[in-house]
A protein has these predicted regions:
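Glycine-rich phosphate/ribose-binding loops and adjacent secondary-structure elements
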Residues: 226-229, 235-272
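Terminal amphipathic alpha-helical/low-complexity segments used for targeting or macromolecular assembly
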Residues: 1-197, 202-208, 214
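Residues in short coils/turns that link rungs of repeat/solenoid architectures in beta-rich domains
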Residues: 97, 119-120, 207, 213, ...
C-alpha cells in the first residue's frame, strides 16, 4: 500500500466533504472586501463551517477556492506567525485549517494542508505534468544509457539494482513496467500538494509538485515535476539556489547550494 497514492486519492476527492462546506455570508463578503480582498465571483469561494474572514487580507481570488479555519499560528524559521492568506493571488485552490500563505504572486491548482506555510514566492502551480514525474526514466551507472529504470516515489536502491542488472529478463521488465504504468495512472491529480507542516519560501518557481510532510523548500531556483517523500522524523530540505526537476526526493534528503538534480539522475553501484 502506497501512502503517497492514498493521499493523492484523498486530495482528489476533496479535503472537505460537501456537508463540511458552506457559502460565504453577505457579512463575510463585506468584511473581506473591506480588507482589500477581491474575487471574480465570491460564489465560487466555499468555506468550512467554522471559517472566519479576519485573517484574509489583500488577496485576489480568480477561480474556485475551498478555505478552512485560518485561526492559529505556524512556526517559520524559528518565529511564530499567525495563520492567514495575505497579499496573494489564488486560482483554484484547496486550503485546509491553520495555513499561512503570504506574498505569493500566483498560487494555481494547489492544495495546502494544515500547518503548511507558503511565503514570498512568485509562481506555485500545477498543470503540464499531472503525475509529479512518476514514471520518468532514471539513468543508473552507465551515462551512455542501457540501464534506465522508470521511477516511482517509494523506489529503493535494491529494486533499482535488480531491474537494471537483469536487462535480459523480459518477463521481469514487462511486469515492472506494467506495475509502474498502473502506479502512473493512479498518481494523476489536478493538484500540486503542500502537505502538513511543509514550508515553501522565497522561490521563483515551484511547479507540479508533491511536497511531503515537514519538508522545506527555501530559496530554491526551481523545483518541478517531483515527489518529495518526507516526514517529521526525516524531513527533506531543498534550499540555496538548488534546481530540482523530474526527481524523487526521499526521506531525509538535502539538496543545497546551487546543486542541480534533473531527470532523476544519480549513480548507484551495480553488479557487473
Amino acid at each position: 500500500t502506497s501512502t503517497f497514492l492514498s493521499m493523492i486519492r484523498r486530495i482528489n476527492d476533496g479535503i472537505y466533504s460537501r456537508s463540511e462546506l458552506r457559502a460565504l455570508s453577505s457579512a463575510e463578503i463585506g468584511t473581506l472586501e473591506r480588507q482589500r480582498n477581491i474575487a471574480r465571483d465570491w460564489r465560487r469561494v466555499r468555506v468550512s463551517r467554522d471559517f472566519t474572514p479576519d485573517p484574509i487580507i489583500g488577496c485576489t481570488f480568480l477561480g474556485s477556492a475551498v478555505i478552512g479555519n485560518l485561526a492559529g499560528t505556524v512556526t517559520v524559521a524559528g518565529f511564530q506567525q499567525p495563520c492567514g492568506l495575505i497579499n496573494s493571488t489564488f486560482y483554484d485552490v484547496q486550503i485546509a485549517d491553520a495555513v499561512l500563505i503570504k506574498n505569493v504572486m500566483t498560487l494555481a491548482s494547489v492544495t495546502a494542508l494544515s500547518g503548511a506555510a507558503i511565503m514570498n514566492c512568485h509562481t506555485i502551480a500545477h498543470g503540464e505534468d499531472t503525475h509529479f514525474g512518476v514514471g520518468k526514466e532514471l539513468k543508473l551507472a552507465v551515462e551512455a544509457g542501457g540501464r534506465e529504470i522508470r521511477i516511482f516515489p517509494e523506489i529503493t536502491i535494491d529494486v533499482a539494482r535488480i531491474i537494471c542488472s537483469r536487462r535480459d529478463d523480459k518477463e521481469l521488465l514487462n511486469e515492472y513496467n506494467r506495475l509502474v504504468d498502473e502506479y502512473f495512472r493512479r498518481a494523476d491529480s489536478p493538484w500540486s500538494v503542500v502537505m502538513n507542516d511543509a514550508r515553501v519560501m522565497n522561490c521563483p518557481k515551484v511547479l507540479n509538485m508533491f511536497i511531503g510532510e515537514a519538508a522545506t523548500i527555501d530559496n530554491a531556483n526551481c523545483v518541478k515535476n517531483t515527489v518529495i517523500i518526507s516526514s517529521r522524523e526525516e524531513p527533506v530540505t531543498i534550499e540555496d539556489g538548488a534546481y530540482v526537476a523530474d526527481c524523487v526526493v526521499q526521506w531525509g534528503g538535502h539538496i543545497a547550494t546551487g546543486a542541480i538534480a534533473e531527470a532523476a539522475e544519480r549513480t548507484i553501484p551495480l553488479p557487473t
